[in-house]
Amino acid sequence: RHNEIVHGKTNNFTMFGSITLNKVVGGINPKAVDVALRLGAKVVWLPTQSAKNHMQKMNQDLSQCVEVVKDGKIVPELRSVLELIRDHNAVLGTAHIAPEEIFTVVEAARDMGVKNIVVTHPEWWIVGMSHEDQLRLVKDYDVILERCYAQNMGGGKYKSNLADNLELIKEVGYKNVMVDTDGGQTENPHWELALAEYMQYLVDHGIPEEQVYH
């Protein structure tokens, strides 16, 4: 509807809604997820700034965090959320949770029949997932790895991910990698310019065009 209203269907760009399960929406809140999905949202992100892992890395008050795993198991509310994601054939995004939590959540999601799973910018230092673990997630659970144009290093500084992304794509294969910008910051190019630079970089460094524009 956004494209239809704003652009009058004059382009082929499609925008999908989402919900992020931070403290502001009640954390792991099945009711909020249910409403979002019934309104047309296609992606459910686990906590970002409210994730325990994020708040630990930022030395913030953990009493305000949203936990997704306790004692090695997903919290009961997350099971309800995963059921909704499965039933609506939506996408689960792991957001800013820790690598060990990602494995627990992904395994539970697959066991419950969730088909579409994106591991959110695993290269970012807040998430900090090794290449080996990323490869293992793809091998064991057939997830999609989101790899971003640049990553926030704190203090308004951003680091290019292009070389590292290229290496991973060559290792894991293009079918299990989703590229995006994670842009919108004044320090980075406009998202469409960043994405064009990203695509061209991959082509210039040996990734076939039919894979880049798959």
Task: Pin down the residues of each PLM region.
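Charged helix-capping and loop-helix junction motifs
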Residues: 30, 75, 130-135, 158-166, ...
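Divalent metal-coordination and catalytic microenvironments
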Residues: 15, 44, 48, 92, ...
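Short acidic/histidine-rich active-site segments
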Residues: 174-191
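Active-site beta-loop-alpha junctions enriched in small/polar residues
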Residues: 18-24, 47-51, 97, 122-125, ...
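Mid-to-C-terminal alpha-helical segments outside catalytic/metal-binding sites
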Residues: 192-214
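Acidic (Asp/Glu)-rich catalytic clusters
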Residues: 2-12, 34-40, 83-86, 109-110, ...
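Extended substrate/RNA-proximal surfaces in nucleic-acid metabolism proteins
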Residues: 11-12, 22-120
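Catalytic pocket-lining loop regions of alpha/beta-barrel enzymes
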Residues: 83, 88-160, 178
